[in-house]
Amino acid sequence: MNTEILGVALQILLLLVISYPLGKHIAKVYKEGNDCMRFMAPIERFIYKLAGINPNEEMDWKAFLKSLLIINVFWFFWGMILLVSQGYLPLNPDGNSGQSPDLAFNTCISFMVNCNLQHYSGESGLTYFTQLFVIMLFQFITAATGMAAMAGIMKSMAAKTTKTIGNFWHYLVISCTRILFPMSLIVGFILIIQGTPMGFDSKMTIPTLEGAEQTVSQGPTAAIVPIKQLGTNGGGYFGVNSSHPLENPTYLTNIVECWSILIIPMALVFALGFYLKRKKLGYVIYGVMLFAYLLGVFCNVHYEMAGNPKIDEMGIDQSCGAMEGKETRLGPGATALWSVTTTVTSNGSLNRMHDSTMPLSGMVEMLNMQINTWFGGVGVGFMNYYAFLIIAVFISGLMVGRTPEFLGKKVEAREMKIATIVSLAHPFVILIFTAISSYVWVYAPEFVESEGGWLNNPGFHGFSEMLYEYTSSSANNGSGFEGLGDNTYFWNYTCGLALIISRYLPIVGQVAIAGLLANKKYTPESAGTLKTDTVTFGVMTFFVIVIVAALSFFPAQTLGPIAEYFSIY
């Protein structure tokens, strides 16, 4: 037990130590171009020339958003064509067939929006070709898209008055060449050294301990797993994700992969402070997010290491904690840390079965995604916080009788309306779709049966499975309570719709707020200006987030994990 807790503490310490210098590097990448990766400039110039891009052309927020949306639409059709026809494409030694149109739609939307919700198993649902030229490609592009959007927001916040927020294509390219690609190489080498496969051979046939034969999938796993983690993508190469011994073979790879999930989202908060030359603001935002993260880690580690009271009643020893759905090589401590890390971001990768977590652990995982603000996905994590920041500024200003201002710009009704829509759209999408699925389950049992029955666990936990699926989709997370049979027409299409709304509506709103504020007249700070870089304002923002986001889900949580908790304790 003590060793497991020490491992958890070590991983958190690694994140805290490395996120600060990495944040400084990221700020230099986006602001000055005078970073340690500037030797990549010739490759970047080649990409610009090949694509016909002028990286020095400034864009206003509307042109910026137009470019962002255009590239996503293009890659959607690219992915759909390849996924449906993958059975006829090269690099398919195992002879896997193409995906059905509804599954391809869900897969393509999911990876295009950085969610990586998987209604298929990677070994049989994809080929090496689509793993590389759809999945891995999307994992770089979608992560870079979020980072580019944040870079545009940072530029708008740093300028006193401007109509432009940078060049989307430039930010997209340098996010890949100077941040994501180099870090992926380092993580990939570590995985290869530890035994993760990297090749294009077909399935291996191996003898088991019982003397029978078993086939084991392999492939270019070590190339895909690093960006899966670093880009907060989360889509597993294998069906069981990082629970698989070839995707996550040792405790060291577990540390590296878990660290990779959160390091860039953490560093981007510091990067904001460095970019704006307001380090104190970065520290306050980082502190709020870190507090919420550590609170979740404490709860999950406690409940998972305490064991299941129902198993205690059977007289079974639980000195190792609640081990159902967990890998013995990792234990409940490391898997509890991972579950919180993967849900405070939009990663969604797994090293255990979330469906087997204790009820309140599952509630913490859902709350992290329902709040969707603590660090979050690369780039979009701060952007979600940004909407609540605007609301907190407005409320605080009214409470103390001051004009609401943020970084010298007046926050007025227009910005508040957009921020309110963005913050309320998330719970609206989750709760409406969960209500629809619950209605269909109760009042259309014939339809549900025609799709395989959906739920393996009716009752409180069955409701939690449906709530979790839409929560994960809307938070661009992609993890799941896998007791839900989700590869059906209903779940593929409804989750796909939730994915589209929840990805693009917030990005459009947040970039619009940044563009509108950037265009306003700058007002120098004075004694009457509301300070946004203080602990007091950080606490205010935290409670605004809890009241607006977390409490919206309390009735639904009561019907699911909270009711399940009282049924077993």
Model-predicted regions and their roles:
Residues 1-106, 161-166, 170, 174-207, ...:
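N-terminal alpha-helical transmembrane segments of multi-pass membrane transport
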Residues 66-76, 138-148, 257-269, 381-395, ...:
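Hydrophobic alpha-helical transmembrane segments
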Residues 68-82, 174-197, 261-264, 273, ...:
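Selective recognition of specific alpha-helical transmembrane segments in multi-pass small-molecule
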Residues 126-200, 255-282:
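A conserved hydrophobic secondary-structure block that centers on an alpha-helix together
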Residues 271-276, 398-412, 512-533:
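Alpha-helical transmembrane segments
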Residues 387-391, 396, 400, 418-457, ...:
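C-terminal catalytic subdomain
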